[in-house]
Amino acid sequence: MAGSAPEAVLVGLGAIPGAWLRLKVVNHFQPMVPKKHWGTFLVNVVACFALGLVLALNETCTASTGIALLMGVGFFGSLSTFSTFAVELLNELRAGQLLTALVLAVASIGVGLLACAVGYGIGTHA
């Protein structure tokens, strides 16, 4: 059943509110010039935590594949945004802000991985 129409519908139904929430969060932080990356950072960290949790629950509680597709692939997959993260890094590098780009990259990957591990840990003990 991989790639079936019902699975695509579940992913799509989850993706719509996830993408909308990402837009709202990123736009909320965008006018705050000193904190211009916080919106992207926040949605990515939240999505990492949630995907870790969904993965663990799917493994330990035999959560429905439909729930994993709806929430994991759809909602949290569209909430996170690696491409925007990459563009923000590129913009910092183009502006000569090597230290800012380095801190952003290390913090985003490190905190994202930690959030994913915490979500997974919570999910395995649920």
Curated annotation (Swiss-Prot):
Q: Where in the cell is it found?
A: Cell inner membrane
In which residues is Na(+) bound? G77, S80
What topology does the record note for this protein and the membrane? Multi-pass membrane protein
* InterPro entries hit by this protein: FluC
Instruction: Please give the chief subcellular localization of this protein.
Output: membrane
The UniProt activity regulation field reads: Na(+) is not transported, but it plays an essential structural role and its presence is essential for fluoride channel function.
Q: Enumerate the Gene Ontology biological process terms.
A: cellular detoxification of fluoride
Per the record, GO CC terms?
Answer: plasma membrane
From the UniProt record, list the reaction(s) this protein catalyses.
fluoride(in) = fluoride(out)
Transmembrane ranges, per UniProt, are 37-57, 67-87, 98-118
Query: Molecular function (GO) terms listed?
Result: fluoride channel activity; metal ion binding
Keywords recorded for this protein, A-Z = Cell inner membrane, Cell membrane, Ion channel, Ion transport, Membrane, Metal-binding, Sodium, Transmembrane, Transmembrane helix, Transport
Q: Which domain of life is it from?
A: Bacteria
Q: What's this chain's function?
A: Fluoride-specific ion channel. Important for reducing fluoride concentration in the cell, thus reducing its toxicity.
Q: Which family does it belong to?
A: Belongs to the fluoride channel Fluc/FEX (TC 1.A.43) family.
What name goes with this protein? Fluoride-specific ion channel FluC 1
In the UniProt record, the gene name given for this protein reads fluC1
